[in-house]
Amino acid sequence: MKKLLLTSLVALGLSISANAADKSKTIIVGATPIPHAEILEVVKPILAKDGYTLEIKEFNDYTTPNLATEDGDLDANFFQHLPYLDEFNKNKGTHLIKTVGVHLEPMGVYSKKIKDIKDLKDGSTVSIPNDPTNESRALDILANAGLIKLNDNPLKTPLDIVDNPKKLKFEEIETAQVPRTLDDVTIAVINTNYALNANLNPVKDALVLESKNSPYVNYVVVKSGNENSPKIKALDKAINSSEVKKFIEIKYNGAILPAF
């Protein structure tokens, strides 16, 4: 009986050790489907060479993956730029930090009603994201296109428009839902990941495309304190590899730009 008990305890100990080893070699990353999860699929075999298993969890919003990373359900996430991350930490009290930059997604202005931004009529309706950083970013694009003028506030809303010569009307929409408004508005300012998901080609379809000098690089994000763990270091190295850079350049053909 004692021998049986000892054998069972040894087996249990081995099982626990194996599970701990498996966890240390498994990297769970949350991402939006396009392009982030697509890029992570390229990272999988690179990490496998170093003995790591990459699990990709897909999300269709910008809130859940950050909360899951804060809570430890994800080792990292990959979907956001630094202004959004900073604003999220401030509003939610989270402790998330960036590690490496991966790519830039130039935001664009799209329409099913007009073919050229010069054809935009007075009183047209414009849909823009409603989260603070992407809303401000969208308004900056419209200002750079000469459609409106803004004050100097760092984060802008339609209330910060100081000149609106075309008397444009603005609808603030949840970021992921902006592409769905294209049938109802004249123009929509859409994040590139959601544009691609809606089968829009930023290079061919955007009436206005954000400057390539935009500061909105997308980063790998982890909870503070985890940035130097072996598996995060392995993830950072793999996602900044030449294989990933080549994939971004070929797959997205200028719609998305490598940032390393």
Feature locations, PLM:
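Immediate post-signal peptide segment of exported/extracytoplasmic ligand-binding proteins
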Residues: 18-28, 47-48, 116-123
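Short, well-ordered beta-strand elements
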Residues: 23-34, 52-58, 125-126
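Short helix-initiation/N-cap motifs at beta->coil->alpha
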Residues: 56-67, 154-180
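Beta->alpha turn/N-cap motifs
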Residues: 58-62, 72, 76-86, 103, ...
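Ligand-binding "clamshell"
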Residues: 87-99, 114, 184, 189, ...
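A conserved helix-loop-strand patch within extracytoplasmic ligand-binding domains
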Residues: 99-148, 245
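A bilobed periplasmic-binding-protein/Venus flytrap-type ligand-binding module shared by bacterial periplasmic
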Residues: 106-117, 217-229
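Periplasmic-binding protein-like
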Residues: 135-143, 239-259
